[in-house]
Amino acid sequence: MQEYIKNEVETLRLRAGATQEDLALRVNVSRQTIIALEKGRYTPSVLLAIKIAGFFKMPVEKVFKIHHGK
């Protein structure tokens, strides 16, 4: 069974009324990185995950979750 990280970044960002650019600027990455992250094509570093969770004022484990797939 393969493990992978799922995230709630897009859902939380939309709920917060923030654009991809807003989030990217706040966590010091490109908008393209946020796009890739939201589409599940990019797994963030621990530092970036902490910054993103901080942006939403949530624990990292509420934003990023380990899933088990086939």
What spans do the regions from the language model cover?
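A short, Lys/Arg-rich alpha-helix, primarily the initiator
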Residues: M1-R15
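Alpha-helical residues within the helix-turn-helix
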Residues: L14, L25, G54
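Short alpha-helical DNA-recognition segment
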Residues: G17-A36
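Key DNA-contact positions within bacterial/archaeal DNA-binding proteins
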Residues: Q32, Y42, E61
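Short, basic-rich loop-to-helix N-cap that marks the start of a DNA-contacting helix
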Residues: R41-K51
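Short, charged recognition helix plus adjacent turn
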Residues: G54, F64-K70
